[in-house]
């Protein structure tokens, strides 16, 4: 597992499950659009951003960008890094049919793609973080 200093913010539990198999990090899910009305979760994200910094990693579909933009406006941008996954057509194994936009989400990405996304976002990765 790869240690990550920042808190990783994802849309849902399947995204969180996928990332927790790769990264040793605090991972918080927004419950999709649920974060819009969840003042406690938003307050938690603000506190975590101040303490450790955040990396936002949402799906590359329209919903993911709406959530990402909401968080951009709600949390000090200086404390938030933006990680992006590529647009790849397909469907996740657990789903019977593709998403509305036909793109793979965070949960459908390979470990290498997710590691690269965090690295490109400037997340603090590495073994030296084990003692944080």
Predicted regions located by residue number:
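Long, charge-dense
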Residues: 73-124
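Short beta-strand scaffold positions
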Residues: 10-11, 58
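Acidic, glycine-rich catalytic loops of TOPRIM or P-loop NTPase phosphate-binding modules used
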Residues: 3-7, 13-17, 21-51
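Short Gly/Thr/Asp-enriched flexible loops that form oxyanion-binding sites at enzyme active sites
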Residues: 66-74
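Acidic, metal-coordinating catalytic cores used for nucleic-acid/nucleotide bond scission
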Residues: 34-35, 57-67
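Conserved small/polar residues in nucleotide/adenosyl-binding loops
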Residues: 130-132
């Amino acid at each position: 597992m790869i240690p990550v200093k920042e808190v990783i913010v994802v849309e849902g539990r399947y995204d969180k499950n996928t990332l927790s198999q790769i990264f040793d990090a605090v991972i918080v899910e927004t419950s999709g659009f649920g974060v819009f009305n969840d003042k406690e979760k938003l307050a938690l994200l603000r506190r975590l951003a101040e303490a450790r910094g955040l990396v936002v990693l949402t799906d590359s579909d329209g919903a993911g960008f709406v959530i990402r933009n909401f968080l951009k406006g709600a949390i000090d941008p200086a404390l938030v890094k933006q990680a992006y996954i590529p647009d790849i057509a397909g469907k996740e194994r657990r789903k019977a049919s593709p998403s509305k936009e036909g793109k793979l989400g965070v949960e459908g990405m390979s470990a290498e793609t997710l590691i690269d996304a965090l690295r490109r976002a400037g997340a603090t990765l590495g073994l030296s973080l084990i003692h944080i």
